């Protein structure tokens, strides 16, 4: 598993370190906000929003080499798509752990 793989993220930016730094800073700011939308969707028992928000984070995580977050997001996306909200709470909690770890790793990367 991987909290953050710089080589994957760099590959997706065409090896442009300036673009990578900009994207990482955006993720540090916007990722937790997007995670809040996932948690709100679960709290409101809105399966469609849960699926959509988890899907968005899955894509960002894949692009930035955050495999732990990608896998957790994918699992929640599938649960939302299937309307299995009672099972989604544990998945959303796993997403939160992965998000917090990713943001911490990016903070170290950007320091």
Protein language model regions, located:
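Two-component system phosphorelay core
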Residues: 1-111
């Amino acid at each position: 598993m991987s909290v953050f793989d710089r080589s994957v993220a760099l590959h997706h930016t065409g090896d442009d370190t300036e673009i990578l730094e900009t994207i990482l800073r955006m993720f540090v700011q916007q990722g937790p906000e997007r995670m809040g939308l996932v948690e709100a969707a679960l709290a409101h028992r809105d399966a469609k929003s849960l699926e959509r928000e988890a899907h968005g984070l899955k894509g960002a995580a894949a692009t930035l080499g955050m495999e732990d977050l990608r896998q957790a997001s994918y699992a929640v996306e599938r649960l939302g798509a299937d309307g299995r909200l009672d099972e989604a709470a544990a998945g959303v909690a796993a997403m939160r752990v992965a998000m917090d770890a990713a943001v911490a790793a990016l903070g170290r990367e950007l320091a």
